[in-house]
Curated annotation (Swiss-Prot):
Its EC number is 3.6.1.21. CDD domains: NUDIX_ADPRase_Nudt5_UGPPase_Nudt14. Residues 139-292 form the Nudix hydrolase domain. Keywords: Chloroplast, Hydrolase, Magnesium, Manganese, Metal-binding, Plastid, Transit peptide. Residues 1-60 form a transit peptide. This is Nudix hydrolase 14, chloroplastic. Mediates the hydrolysis of some nucleoside diphosphate derivatives. Can use ADP-glucose, ADP-mannose and ADP-ribose as substrates. Regulates the intracellular ADP-glucose levels linked to starch biosynthesis. Pfam families: NUDIX. It catalyses: ADP-sugar + H2O = AMP + alpha-D-aldose 1-phosphate. Its main location: plastid. Expressed in roots, leaves, stems and inflorescences. It comes from Arabidopsis thaliana (Mouse-ear cress).
Amino acid sequence: MAGFTLLPSRLLAFPSRALPRRLHHHHAKLILRCKMSSSSSSLTQSITLPSQPNEPVLVSATAGISSSDFRDAIDSSLFRNWLRNLESESGILADGSMTLKQVLIQGVDMFGKRIGFLKFKADIFDKETGQKVPGIVFARGPAVAVLILLESDGETYAVLTEQVRVPTGKIVLELPAGMLDDDKGDFVGTAVREVEEEIGIKLKKEDMVDLTAFLDPSTGYRIFPSPGGCDEEMSVFLYRGQVEKETIRQLQGKETGLREHGEFIKVRLIPYRELWRKTADAKVLMSIGLYEMAQREGLVSSQRLKPNS
């Protein structure tokens, strides 16, 4: 197929597709003004939020958290984005019926020089009843996942990764996915990079369709995979392409990933018609739902791709 090249360095170049343009939506920016004062005797900070100016929030650290990790945690985009979400239009503190009393920083995991994961406990109370709502938070920030569909000889294949997932104790079959490295919000750029690292396919940004951009504005155009305990918000992208059967054969079982980062990945291709029953990965099942409904609404094409189109 013209325009398709299999590179020895594990990169594949896919031709451009005239898929529907990705919708561009952005979160409204909330200017957060915090007044902080530190205590020399313990790791504490007093934060004043705009929504409750007369009720300072005490932020403290559990035993074992260093002063530098405590400061980095408070200054991190993970923590500040969580505070912004509290005061956003649909935030917990928006209507004044609840109040944030204190936050206890319990764990900080560094990814190089930046905070990758943050664990804390927030004490938020309903003002009318005085009852505290569950507030254990595992903060990891925004992420992306990509549904890659490759058509070949009348069959459509989904491209998945097979990875070691220590939290589950299992090897999991899942969509290519990854976290944003910073708070600049380049979701589509991160999606393209993750596909290249995990699958060995080089895509173009303009060929990606943001399936989460079709959601209602009240969602913020993101999906929360586990809102009961984690702040992660995810964008799900779609890529469709047509390839030769030989490409399917070469991708199947291919070993990829950044070994120096502990990524031991195998590429698995599954017929799309069987995808919904082949894995318990929530990202896969979410992407199927988004893709199928977007097709039903005419937001993405349901027609098969033609060679050289």
